[in-house]
């Protein structure tokens, strides 16, 4: 089926839903029809723009035969022939299956991997880079856990980033980030390679994840600071274990046990929700015989080479020589390119 046939079907379906809603559907039938109509409406609006532009193109084409109108018609045709492909591509993208998590806020988790102290230092810098990115996008960045190492690095950093479309922008950051540079403690000037892992999870709610109290083991203990010394005489730290999956979340950032428990539950729910999403995604990918998405988290996704001032995203072979600006939070060039790459893969998979 060609694109135009699909567009005609979408318009017909929208008109069918509009008529059904006008007839007075009630209950779940009304809710279901309303949701589908709301999803189709913006696509139908774009189709209307396309059809109008195509009509104007035909009219301008006809005017070419008139010597007095030829110059004006040629100018209009040039504009329309540039605009129509853009409209058609916009419609193709609007027709792609939507990830309902894209509009959600997100949980960001960063941990050092290989490289010891240098990995911990870069983890702290990357955590701060995402904080700056959130500020540039107008999002709220709330630190949920910041476990600092003795040298000022980061053992574990978790943040709740709140705003519209946060997950859609940050989901491509999940994976292994590699840093290449000369550590401050390196006397021979040798470049060291270290790695940091980043996980970005869509924020989940009670509707998304059902957790039975009997599935949880909750332990409380005294919070400890750098080097293991106790910094709180009360048992304010909380560790929650989800027994069916073995997932464990520990939280000690707050002085209040209640606040630490609430934060730990928020992270646990996000991790459980992501497990469900990953399982569903794997099933869909197997059905299509191809992996469509943001890549395996176990793979290296990006390299930050400080001596060369270079940042390279290995998934799309994009290199930018502006490492200082990237570390100041300017990730949009990479996010935009990754978004376009994913859209291209989805368009191919959907036959659009």
From Swiss-Prot:
Its main location: cytoplasm. Gene3D superfamilies: 3.30.160.20, 3.30.70.1660, 6.10.140.1950. Methylated by PrmC. Methylation increases the termination efficiency of RF1. It is found in: Cytoplasm. InterPro entries: PCRF, Pep_chain_release_fac_I, Pep_chain_release_fac_I_sf, Prokaryotic/Mito_RF, RF-1. It comes from the Bacteria. Keywords: Cytoplasm, Methylation, Protein biosynthesis. The modification N5-methylglutamine is found at residue 229. The keyword Metal-binding does not apply. PROSITE patterns: RF_PROK_I. GO terms for cellular component: cytoplasm. GO terms for molecular function: translation release factor activity, codon specific. The keyword Oxidoreductase does not apply. Belongs to the prokaryotic/mitochondrial release factor family. PANTHER family: LD18447P. Peptide chain release factor 1 directs the termination of translation in response to the peptide chain termination codons UAG and UAA. This is Peptide chain release factor 1.
